[in-house]
Amino acid sequence: MVADPTTTLQVKNTGSLSVNRYGWINIWMAILGQFFTLFPLFFESCLILLKTWLEIFPDNAGILRIYLLQFSAIVGYKTRRAA
């Protein structure tokens, strides 16, 4: 009897995140992403308030215009470099 390589239970190295061969983490993230996109106001309301409080250049008409540049540090971002 020959061993079938598709039935092994070995886990491939995916960096710092261990995922089984069925990719359950991808399935759950897709489900949660579809669920949480239904509630953008709930999750973004604090961010909207913060941006209006930190408004740098208010215009004279009283219309809120937000001129914030947001830079987030990308930690652990790996790119392929040309050899």
Swiss-Prot record:
Belongs to the YqgD family. This is Protein YqgD. It comes from Escherichia coli (strain K12). The gene is yqgD.
